[in-house]
Amino acid sequence: MRIKKVWAVYFSGTGTTEKTVRRIAAGMAQALDAELAVYDFTTPAARQRELRFGAEGLAVLGVPVYAGRVPNVLLPYLTKQLHGGGALAVPVVLFGNRNFDDGLIELRNILTEDGFMPVAGGAFVGEHAFSRTLGAGRPNGDDLAEMDAFARRAAEKVTALTAAPAEPVAVWGETPIRPYYTPRDRHGNPINILKVKPKTDMDRCGGCGLCAARCPMGSIDPADVSQVTGICIKCCACVKGCPAEAKYFDDAGYLYHKSELEEVYACPAANEVFL
């Protein structure tokens, strides 16, 4: 098939999904001799815009995995604002060294329902949003090499097609999609961190406003960054993006869950690709 434009489309709180999607899309665009376009829908304003694709396009679309699934706050955008129009797609998910569970198959199914035809898919490891040690430094050089190889193989598959496939690419995951992963304490009791919000050390804060500008939910008050006026999805864009390290979480359940993840899933996880 002749593809004229390859899109890199992504939500990325801390930058790992952006790095991965842009790398794969750039590799595919080069291999397919196609134009490269980029759309970042991380901010609330960006999620107001509809994106329409066509039969001569291909979208590498990526999101992070939250609790083993596509983040539920992204579902309205993914299901209503994207229109595939027969374009090919490569769904990509980033997971923080635990597991991508049903995140990839859920994203594949969403894109199929949006009018795309997924022809390849990948689940890649990125440093966990909660942690600086879990999946530390990933994607690293080896991961980038795997992304490049995946991009080449996916492009070769597309080039060999005479028409769009009748069925989307088979990927790992269960149908029906399983519930969101629930963290538990040492006694097996569920830990609910849905309403947990970050704190701000105002003695450290320099008032730059980056946290408010980068919050994907627009929940941090730019006039007083210590105030989180909307929902927090624990993407940690504010924590990891603060140059003064003034943002932090101190909720006991959150910290227990973070510590447990770092202990149980310390062994580096592998990327998985599907063609």
Predicted regions mapped to residue ranges:
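FMN-binding flavodoxin-like domain, especially the glycine-rich phosphate-binding loop
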Residues: 1-19, 23-43, 49-191, 250-275
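Acidic, Ser/Thr-rich low-complexity intrinsically disordered segments
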Residues: 176-217
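Iron-sulfur cluster-binding cysteine motifs and their immediate structural context
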Residues: 200-201, 206-233, 237-255
